[in-house]
Regions:
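Conserved small/polar residues in nucleotide/adenosyl-binding loops
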Residues: 147-150
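N-terminal, positively charged regions that mediate nucleic acid binding
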Residues: 1-52
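Terminal, basic amphipathic appendages of nucleotide-handling enzymes
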Residues: 39-97
């Protein structure tokens, strides 16, 4: 048996298991974790529980630390800013006449990059779009095709 917590990064998103690293973490608390996207702040939706070793992902990562009020404020501000980033990107896509559908915008906690998730029927040359967005947001821009996530 392995001790895990379940963490969610978006209000209605999927939850993921993390190693609580010996901490007594309760549902509703926030933790800082390292994910494939970078450092993230997530809400604990299931406190410490034991599950069968066979149900644990092979690469179970430990939490980095408990989130503090600054982290939670930053996460909430990022969610608000993602809405504006989404609309700005939509305008840029239209201006460039690109055949793609923007699905979502997402900042990393430290704002070192914004991921713009999109779908497209064919190949899209978004190099000029990325340049424009980098000039507007002054951070790394990462376009992510949903077709490549499955």
């Amino acid at each position: 048996m392995k001790k895990v917590i379940s963490v969610r990064f978006k209000e209605n998103g999927k939850s993921y298991y993390f190693d609580p690293a010996g901490a007594d973490i309760k549902t509703g608390e926030y933790v800082i974790v390292e994910t494939a996207r970078g450092v993230e702040c997530g809400e604990v939706v299931q406190g410490v529980k034991e599950i069968a070793d066979s149900a644990v992902p092979k690469a179970l990562k430990p939490i980095t630390r408990m989130a503090d009020s600054v982290d939670v404020r930053r996460m909430r501000q990022n969610r608000e800013d993602e809405k504006r980033a989404y609309h700005t990107c939509q305008e840029c896509i239209a201006r460039h006449g690109l055949e793609m559908k923007l699905v979502e915008a997402e900042y990393t906690l430290d704002r070192s990059k914004i991921m713009f998730y999109f779908t497209a029927d064919g190949r899209v040359d978004f190099r000029e779009l990325v340049k424009d967005l980098a000039g507007i947001f002054h951070t790394r821009i990462e376009p992510v095709s949903y077709t490549h996530l499955t």
